[in-house]
Regions:
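Conserved nucleotide-sensing/catalytic segment adjacent to the nucleotide-binding pocket
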Residues: 15-86
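Short phosphate-engaging motifs
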Residues: 5, 74, 102
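Conserved NTP phosphate-binding and transfer environment spanning the P-loop NTPase/kinase superfamily
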Residues: 85-92, 96-181
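Glycine-rich phosphate-binding P-loop
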Residues: 1-15
Length: 181
């Protein structure tokens, strides 16, 4: 799910010596409509692919390599098809963190970002979120009620994430319930 601290876990694994590819880091994007806010400009898809290839060259491909399960596109860049297809065959460690914990983590991550761009991001997902919920989220943003903004938008992202997960073979999904981010 969104807001479970997946990126932080990847960074912790890397500090412990695990082989990690941070696709969002390479893409300069957090992987959602809100993902590019206050980050450097994204590379071109070609630059992204070159950076990814360079990372892979420095790893032992006979050993596990940890990556975050992403959609084919991260912002405006696309994961190379062969890499994306390989990701789809690998086990998924699905992190279940209490909703309230995820809300707090996302508030901490996003509340200090550019407010206008946060509003624009809500606008980008308004149709999928539902115009009424989008309007409520924009009003909450204006009131700086970030818990409400995150709560409203998480329902969309949870549904989206589960839809993607259903495309995976059930035998490749390992659930982990953790109490906090």
């Amino acid at each position: 799910y969104t807001g479970t601290g997946k990126t932080e876990i990847l960074h912790a694994l890397k500090r412990k010596g695990a082989q990690v590819i941070d696709l969002e880091g390479l893409a300069n994007h957090r992987g959602s409509a809100f993902g590019g806010i206050d980050l450097p400009e994204q590379p071109t898809t070609e630059q992204f692919e070159n950076k990814l290839f360079s990372e892979i060259q420095n790893l032992d491909t006979t050993q596990p390599i940890w990556v975050e399960d992403e959609s084919k596109s991260i912002g405006k860049v696309s994961i190379p098809n062969a890499f994306y297809l390989k990701m789809g065959t690998m086990p998924v460690y699905f992190l279940e963190v209490p909703f309230a914990e995820r809300v707090q983590h996302l508030v901490h991550t996003y509340a200090n970002l550019n407010q206008q761009k946060l509003g624009e991001a809500i606008g980008k997902i308004a149709k999928r979120l539902g115009n009424d919920k989008a309007k409520l989220a924009l009003e909450a943003l204006e009131d700086k009620n970030y818990d409400k903004v995150v709560t409203l938008t998480l329902f969309y992202y949870d549904k989206y994430y589960l839809k993607g997960l259903k495309k995976r073979a059930e035998s490749t999904i390992l659930n982990f319930e953790i109490p906090t981010v």
